[in-house]
Amino acid sequence: MRNVFLLPVGQLTAERGGPEAASLVFWGTGATRVRVVSRLPAAVNEQIGHEFAASHQYVAIAVYYDAETLPQLAAHFYRQAVEERNHAMMLVQYLLDAGEDVAVPGVAEPQTSFSNAAEPVELALAQEKTVTQQIAGLVELARQENDLVGEQFLHWFLKEQREEVSSMSALLAVVKRAGDSLLLVEDFLSRNAVGDQGAPEADAPAAAGGAL
């Protein structure tokens, strides 16, 4: 079943006939009908691409640290890569459950070269802040369209992003304080849980194919 959302009158368009599109409703009778189309499914499809891109970037960061023989940092970002992949698949499942089309996009090549050990974490923090803004935009769009189900679904991601920004900020502070003594960072990560440790949270949305 397609989702139906109400938009402000200024966003309505009248048309004569034509095939029904995703996430719309027709009002009126006769040849002239009013069509209301939700913009949220397309925006969620776009966010799927952002989540996969984030996962791809975290793989590149993990490989960088692995090559530098920093196994704790590498393991942290391998977990982050899986987590972002899971987020993408949660969005996929949301669209599938809503009866919407899913368009899995390609992703741009990630950054693979870094000038120092802190740069990858700086990049990761900037990425998490960007994703937070993107999710906030989706929540606002759902609210504009009076899509209460979509807004409730997306609030989990907002909470998750707050935690991600906080944990990545903490990791960056540790890396910067350590300077060239990166074994101190390795020791810190071996003794302290920073971010999610791999298992999906109990209240996490279902992921298409199952979370890894």
Predicted features along the sequence, with ranges:
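Iron-associated oxidoreductase/ferritin-like identity signal
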Residues: 1-212
